[in-house]
Amino acid sequence: MHALRLVDDWPVATVAAAFVAPDGSVSTTGPTDHRFRLASIAKMLVGWSVLIGRDEGIVSLDDAAGPAGCTLRHLLAHASGLPFEGDVPVAPPGSRRIYSNTGIELAAQHLADAAGMQFDDYLRDGILEPLGMTATTLDGSPAHAVHSTLDDVLRFVRELRSPRLVDPATAAEFSTVQFASLGGIVPGLGRFDDCPWGLGTEIRGTKQPHWTGTRNSPATFGHFGGAGTLLWVDPVIDVACVALTDRPFDEWSSDALRLWPALADAVIAECGA
């Protein structure tokens, strides 16, 4: 776990990190049972929940949802035209990649309405309890207000690497680019002419610079959060990495965008990938 020693020098009070090697072995550092705010990593849980609902037959990704002309797929892929916050569109659906907390919240509400239950109950019944994520709670907006531990996030990572809650074809769609070739902004990184996104998860593509490493494949998917957190899975080399901290990203963004890729490259090198 030499790569994980890099987090010892991060300018944060508390950090817990891990990586999963191609053989499934897990290396960790830091307090694995400490609860952190995941921030936007929560969006991945919304996307996975919707896909469970799709497999159950209660929703379709092509359901009308959100602004006129918008579908559930648009909402999850940040292609709805909604702004970061607010319910008044600033662009037509499918025309730009506009990162939107509101879009994710509307996707979660659409699923909840279809299921006839609150979204936090659906999340608990659909993901948290089946995966044994007993320390994870939704404490507000499903777009960013989930608290969890490294142990629990690793349980979700195992599901992403080897799905059992959704059909394999459904799982593949999660990390497949939706509405290809849309330009847009990744908050904290900048604007990209090609800004690929899946269904609640960012896809690395050819973005440069990026918060993942130079050794990560373009197929790498995941999310980083404003709470100073990150999760990525590289399906090409079958390596995953998680790092949770207690320092907001905005307070150390320049350092984070140097240190996070360095960690990713070190993890991949240690895995021999």
PLM regions: where:
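Active-site helix/loop module of the DD-peptidase/beta-lactamase fold
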Residues: 37-41, 45, 53-89, 98-99, ...
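A generic beta-sheet turn/junction motif
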Residues: 52-54, 235-236
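Hydrophobic alpha-helical segments
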Residues: 19, 42-46, 50-51, 156
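Well-ordered alpha-helical segments within folded domains of soluble proteins
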Residues: 45-47, 102-109, 151-155
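Catalytic loop of the DD-peptidase/beta-lactamase superfamily, centered on the K-T-G motif
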Residues: 1-29, 33-37, 95-96, 112-117, ...
